[in-house]
Amino acid sequence: MQRYNFKTAEEKWQKIWKEKKSFKTSIKKNKKKFYCLEMFPYPSGNIHMGHVRNYTIGDVLARYKKLNGFNVLHPMGWDSFGMPAENAARENNLHPMMWTKKNIETMKRQLKLLGLSIDWDREISTCNPEYYKHQQKFFLEMYEKGLVKKKENYVNWDPVDKTVLANEQVINGKGWRSGATVERKKLSQWFFEITKFSQQLLDSLENLENWPNKVKLMQKNWIGRSLGCEINFEILGSNQVKKISCFSTRPDTLFGLSFLAISVDHPVSKFYENNKEFINFKNECSKTGTTEEALAKAEKIGFKTNLIAINPLDKNMKAPVYIANFVLMDYGLGAIFGCPAHDQRDLDFAIKYKLQVNPVVLPPNEDKKKFKINKQAYTGEGEIINSKLLNGLSAPDKSVSKTISILEEKKIGKGKINFRLKDWGISRQRYWGCPIPIVYKKNGDIIPVPKKDLPITLPKDVDLNCKGNPLDHHRTWKYTKINNEEVIRETDTLDTFVDSSWYFLRFCSPHNLNYGYDNEDLNYWMPVDQYIGGVEHAILHLLYSRFFMRAIAYQNNNFKYVEPFSGLFTQGMVCHETYKDEKGKWVSRDEIELVNDKTFVKKGSREKVIVGPAEAMSKSKKNIIDPENVIQNLGADTIRWFILSDSPPGKDIQWSEEGISASFKFIQKLWNLNLNIINRKGKKTDENEDDKLEKYTIKMF
């Protein structure tokens, strides 16, 4: 039996594909189109098994469509701006561009080893000025349309990366890249006004029939549409403050009122700005992040004012007003009324400050006389109690709408739809990102950079070891002239998620020098027919891309697309066993050996190793497998076959030596089967030979 020489075969065919430009995109008008795209990679240094799985899935689909007569667009690019390059440049004393280019060369070579059917003529890189000059144009156009604003706001500050994070980039209260505990800081920032499209983004989810339901649900919850009410509270105790308005999704619990809580940035707080106790309290608040998650986990603290709020539905019911760390100015009206019996956050606060807890929703099958709230708030459905004119109403289905009607009738409240989604903060205090095409006059006036002066490129002679933003310290770049007037450049750069919010458009017209895309190309290729990537991007990249399409289409009759991806597939993770030594430190597979077929120990020391569960491959857990080593030893077809066949592509897959060995044997069997078929075809002796070959093939499989 002849052995399959995968190195010879792979080198031969990859050479043929390159010479014949087999995967170059062509457009034949009599054929249907198929745009297949996997989420493009960050050039971190080497490809990993997640890349192998992602791009192999897309490659099989692209090849299948091409064989079925489609015009296929299957491109590749690099999401090449970002903090890791800047950090690596500092550590290795080299420029981020050098580090990035070297990594791109390495990863491109590795991807080619996989034999992917990629049109490399359309390759793009987001750190290339030929790419980001178009992004700067988009920014200016959105600024002209009123979709970009600069405003002061509390932001999520990563103290390690020393940059701002969007809410979506804070995971479990920590920075998505650095892992540092996020702090709250007030800065003047640029924002994309994504909230203008909240309802559109929500409604259009229903039209995405070829998206996973879990992704649509995640976006729906993140957008967070809620029907509530603005309620006006009369205030006692001050000649300066007569009224405070709150937003609530549960106005029906007004008779459970225990306190009012307002944000540290609420206009009322200015009356306490010279109070030492309030100053200390405000400083303490800065240690809390701005995300709902961070606020939920933080200890609830408040500053008690001298103000008293009167319940608008019962003038005899009064409650103290606090300034609290868990209320944000950019949600609702920056003020809430606390009903501790039916909101856990409010209950924690009430217990801490010994405030009243009045139950107003009775759970089903509970005795009204015996029902009490201790340390757990009741947040379920029930019947309204202890609420005078609302008593007996079913909560919340009947009681909310009834309460809103009463408040509107009395002109002390108004029904309102609110969204959880916040405007997208896009300013980042880093060097290695797309420069924002804005300059400032000496008096602070904003001037958009003329489009003829684009791109605004990054200076090459930058000091990355200075504290804070390197661009802020580069005087010859920071201070410049526009129309012979001395101006100061914006030194923040754009969030890298902006770079990836439109790259799929650039692939349609990668060589267009005048604009980011060509309408004729877009009219043929868009939307992407099949997009492939991780579910972790559901409320980041996937939501931002949907917004970006709408932002381009806004007041633009030449752009008709609102959804970038008609089909979405989210692949599972590639997992591997984890190993720890007796001190609890992660150990790699290369550092251990098996003794007596049952015990793992560290090589050399013979220290016992604890085998943990299979987890997603990561450098930090030292459970990665180098794809290039597997390709060099077993061939690209082996790794591709294993990654596709061992588990459904939407599920996690566990890497195993047994599985990859079995895949190698299968490829050998397939090779020999084909050789036998070819040989028997050449020696065809009777008319029934084709039937015999078919039976033989089935038997061999």
What do the predicted segments below correspond to?
Residues 282-306, 314-315, 355-363, 389-409, ...:
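Conserved catalytic alpha/beta cores of large enzymes that bind or transform nucleotide phosphates
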